[in-house]
């Protein structure tokens, strides 16, 4: 039986950790001039994927 393909977009966006999957915070790529320094600072740290979405990410990354 052939191997299951990994979704390459998901592989670039998520990283497996011991407690789940790590992801980058959204809304921090461009159009940052109208956002305050406080808002940009709050968007800086990585976050965990929500428990409702973990099954979807696991399906996209079967070998993670």
UniProtKB/Swiss-Prot annotation:
Please give the Gene3D superfamilies that the UniProt record associates with this protein.
Answer: 4.10.410.60
Q: Which GO terms describe its cellular component?
A: cytosolic large ribosomal subunit
Does the keyword Calcium belong to this entry?
Answer: no
UniProt entry keywords in alphabetical sequence:
Ribonucleoprotein, Ribosomal protein
Record GO biological process = translation
Q: Which InterPro entries match?
A: Ribosomal_bL35, Ribosomal_bL35-like, Ribosomal_bL35_CS, Ribosomal_bL35_sf
Which GO MF term does the entry hold, naming one?
A: structural constituent of ribosome
HAMAP family per UniProt: Ribosomal_bL35
The Swiss-Prot or TrEMBL record describes its family as follows: Belongs to the bacterial ribosomal protein bL35 family.
UniProt-recorded name of the protein: Large ribosomal subunit protein bL35
What species does this protein belong to?
Alcanivorax borkumensis (strain ATCC 700651 / DSM 11573 / NCIMB 13689 / SK2)
Q: Which gene encodes it?
A: rpmI
């Amino acid at each position: 039986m052939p191997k299951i393909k990994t979704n390459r977009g998901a592989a670039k966006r998520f990283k497996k950790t011991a407690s789940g999957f790590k992801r980058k915070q959204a809304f921090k790529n461009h159009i940052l001039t109208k956002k305050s320094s406080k808002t940009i600072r709050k968007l800086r740290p990585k976050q965990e994927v929500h428990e409702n979405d973990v099954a979807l990410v696991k399906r996209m990354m079967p070998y993670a």
